[in-house]
Amino acid sequence: MKRVKLIVAYDGTGYCGWQVQPNEITVEGVLNKHISELTGEDIKVIGASRTDSGVHALGNVAVFDTESRIPGEKMAKALNARLPEDIIIQDSKEVPLDYHPRFQDTRKTYEYTFYNARYDNPVTSRHHHFVYVPLDVEKMKEAASYFLGEHCFISMCSSKAQVTSLSLIHISEPTRLAL
């Protein structure tokens, strides 16, 4: 038995989040299906972090246990040949059996992108929140500063994760994407 660590990136637009849900298409469900088909085993991945419906991820960590003879380092290539184009395995490798992504990979980065213009951009609209009124970046920076530091989110977290430390907030002036 070995444990394989995956670094997963996905466009969550077409998924009902990460976690398996009855009668819904989820990222975890798609990974379980394709890894099971590849290995011939009933595979259940364990993810470091769950995302909500429609949320994208770059670098989400997951592991699974397998008896497969496919080396951990080759699993990314083998899976990418089978997965839909909106899910990519960026890297794969074998890790110790006691490695758990929820406890070893505890740092997360969230990015929220606002597209501020008179009209939305249909080419990139799945990856930003559209705001047509002018934004005051200085006021946004001032408001964001209140989130820095350590905060107790007991009402919104499991009993194991009640305190969160927020170390950096970066707000930048808008840029235009030339296509």
Report the location of each language-model feature.
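Catalytic/RNA-binding core of pseudouridine synthases
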Residues: 1-149
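Short, flexible loop/turn motifs enriched in small residues
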Residues: 1-2, 166-168
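Amphipathic alpha-helical interaction segments
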Residues: 23-26, 161, 170
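Generic beta-strand hydrophobic packing signal
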Residues: 48, 92, 156, 172-173
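A general structural signal for well-ordered secondary-structure junctions
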Residues: 150-153, 177
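Short catalytic/ligand-gating loop segments at beta-alpha or beta-beta junctions
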Residues: 154-164
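Single conserved hydrophobic/aromatic residue that forms the stacking wall/gate
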Residues: 169-179
